[in-house]
């Protein structure tokens, strides 16, 4: 004779199975929608021609003209597994999905640099699940046709830094009156933190938040072994003394 405990176990198993089926069906629908959205972008600018097209734009800055500190800072704070994944980071996706489901929002991105590049080039910044699926397809295609260095260069030349500055060249000039190659390590760290939320972290309007964000960047660089704790403390003092944070 079945006990109440046995019945509850069976009900739980069926409920879990039903939930898995619903998730699988939803994933299939989103996958199809994402694929269609991604394919619609390709006739205008195919992934195979992306680097050739973007690198021909005036002011495009290559890695040999960008300080290593800036490269290290961006990868540390935005996509520490950049060199390991193929455009999509399953670990980051699972973490982001769990956060989104738990908070019933789309607040957590989990996007790699390649996905962010795909979003900047092909899609709007309005968050919805179909667009996230389309980003995955686009990122995989970009990684298939472009090297990691090319992807990084395209990313830093298309992201928004706030104050009307798009790309590292405009940001270096707009905030510091320099070329990217002339940036100091402190300036590199400050700039690396801005694209996450350009309006919120603007050195002009929110210097305190910009300084706090730079500390996040430094902490990530220490975690990724790109800086020692002593070097990070010294850089934070240099960042705090930057004229752009003092309104001068």
Model features per residue range: what roles?
Residues 1-248:
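Juxtamembrane regions of bacterial inner-membrane/periplasmic proteins
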């Amino acid at each position: 004779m079945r006990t109440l405990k046995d019945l509850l176990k069976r009900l739980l198993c069926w409920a879990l199975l039903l939930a898995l089926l619903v998730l699988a069906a939803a994933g299939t629908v989103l996958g199809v929608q994402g694929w269609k959205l991604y394919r619609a972008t390709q006739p205008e600018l195919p992934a195979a021609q992306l680097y050739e097209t973007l690198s021909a734009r005036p002011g495009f800055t290559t890695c040999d003209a960008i300080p290593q500190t800036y490269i290290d800072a961006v990868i540390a704070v935005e996509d520490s597994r950049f060199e390991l994944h193929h455009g999509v980071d399953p670990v980051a996706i699972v973490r982001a999905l769990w956060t989104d489901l738990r908070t019933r929002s789309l607040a957590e991105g989990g996007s790699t640099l390649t996905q962010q590049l795909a979003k900047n080039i092909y899609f709007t910044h309005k968050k919805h699940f179909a667009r996230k699926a389309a980003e995955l397809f686009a990122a995989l295609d970009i990684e298939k046709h472009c090297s990691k260095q090319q992807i990084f260069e395209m990313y830093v030349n298309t992201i928004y830094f706030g104050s009307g500055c798009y790309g590292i060249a405009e940001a270096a000039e707009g905030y510091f009156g320099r070329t990217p190659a002339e940036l100091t390590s402190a300036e590199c760290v400050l700039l690396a933190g801005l694209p996450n939320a350009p309006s919120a972290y603007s050195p002009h309007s929110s210097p305190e938040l910009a300084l706090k964000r730079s500390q996040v960047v430094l902490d990530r660089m220490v975690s990724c072994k790109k800086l020692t704790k002593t070097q990070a403390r010294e850089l934070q003092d240099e960042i705090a003394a930057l004229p752009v944070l003092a309104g001068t």
